[in-house]
Amino acid sequence: MKAPVNSGSSANKQIAPEGTHVARCYQIIDKGTTFDEKWQNRKRKIQFMFELPMELAVFNEEKGEQPFYVKTVFNLSMGEKASMRKFIESWFGKKMTDKQAADFEIFTLIGAACMINVVHNGKEDRTYANIMSISPMPKGMQCPPAVNMPMCYDTTAHDEQVFIMLPEFMQEDIKKSDEWLSRQSQSATSWSKPNYPTNNFQTANTNGQGLTDDLDALFGSSDDKNPF
């Protein structure tokens, strides 16, 4: 997971501070299957983004204070040794059975709170904020209301309304995926208007309360969420 800070026009960009932070998952994006240069094979990747509601800064004068964010990317796998499975198990402080892992619905993690440990790593003239570890929220401790609008995207169940809200560079990456190219190939021979699901989430207000109510309606109380 990378968040460049000192490169070209990004020289003054702020990144999440080091340390242990209260966090909430607000975005999960399936990036599809592309060629992995490191491993020299094709891998399907998924990205998780977390807001840090107690760490605020002004990134845009018109918007005022907003929370920092951090992100991490995994291979889309819930195998016993898979990094994503270990990450989710650490998130909730509980081991999964193979059946639980196979049945686990990843998008249920949207809105889930946690504690994350952020470290800074440098490479050449850049500094990155990385998630070193994740753990459950301590008992009795609450995560502040959500600020960012929750978002999830699945390359095998394309939602144009969500896709157009993604950054352009991410859209371009997804368009290179096997899933996107396969869908384009199929639609070239048989096209019909997709039935996009309705997004029932409200846009967050200044304190995020309306959005939190929506999340609680879907997943229950913000406290002690455990999807497995």
Give the predicted meaning of each segment.
Residues 1-228:
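Short beta-rich binding modules
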